[in-house]
């Protein structure tokens, strides 16, 4: 009896998914998940060659989300996504525009940035 060898594990296809964008002041993280919340692909701006102050730019966030969108389309067959944005960073709008320009249909954009109601004490003021 012959043994059949498989070349590799084929990725499951997900037509719909969720893309989480976490934009901090120093970096932007992009996480592609299925509807249940299981992570399929994750990336950040720093992983694509941007370093230092260039990581916090909208251009860098757009490039990283472009790579994440292409991976979601080619590897997982995603077509429809909903976007969840967290954080006060600058790259959120550029990241969403890059997702739409790559061919993903964005059904909803939710901003779930945590807003403190006079929570923790702020850092001391910077004296210049």
From Swiss-Prot:
Gene3D superfamilies in the cross-refs: Ribosomal protein S11
One Pfam family here: Ribosomal_S11
UniProt-recorded Gene Ontology molecular function terms: rRNA binding; structural constituent of ribosome
GO biological process, one term: translation
Gene Ontology CC terms, in alphabetical order: ribonucleoprotein complex; ribosome
UniProt entry keywords in alphabetical sequence: Ribonucleoprotein, Ribosomal protein, RNA-binding, rRNA-binding
SUPFAM superfamilies xrefs: Translational machinery components
Domain of life: Bacteria
Quaternary structure (record): Part of the 30S ribosomal subunit. Interacts with proteins S7 and S18. Binds to IF-3.
Role summary: Located on the platform of the 30S subunit, it bridges several disparate RNA helices of the 16S rRNA. Forms part of the Shine-Dalgarno cleft in the 70S ribosome.
Family: Belongs to the universal ribosomal protein uS11 family.
Protein name: Small ribosomal subunit protein uS11
Organism: Wolbachia sp. subsp. Brugia malayi (strain TRS)
Lineage start: Bacteria, Pseudomonadati, Pseudomonadota, Alphaproteobacteria, Rickettsiales
């Amino acid at each position: 009896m012959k043994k059949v060898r498989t070349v590799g594990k084929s990725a499951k296809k997900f037509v719909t998914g969720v893309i989480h964008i976490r934009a901090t002041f120093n970096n932007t993280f992009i996480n592609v998940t299925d509807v249940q919340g299981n992570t399929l692909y994750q990336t950040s701006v720093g992983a694509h060659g941007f370093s230092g102050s260039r990581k916090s730019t909208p251009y860098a966030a757009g490039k990283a989300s472009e790579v994440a969108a292409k991976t979601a389309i080619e590897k997982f067959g995603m077509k429809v996504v909903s976007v969840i944005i967290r954080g006060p960073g600058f790259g959120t709008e550029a990241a969403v525009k890059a997702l739409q320009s790559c061919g993903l249909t964005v059904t909803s954009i939710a901003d779930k940035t945590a807003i403190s109601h006079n929570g923790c004490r702020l850092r001391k003021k910077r004296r210049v």
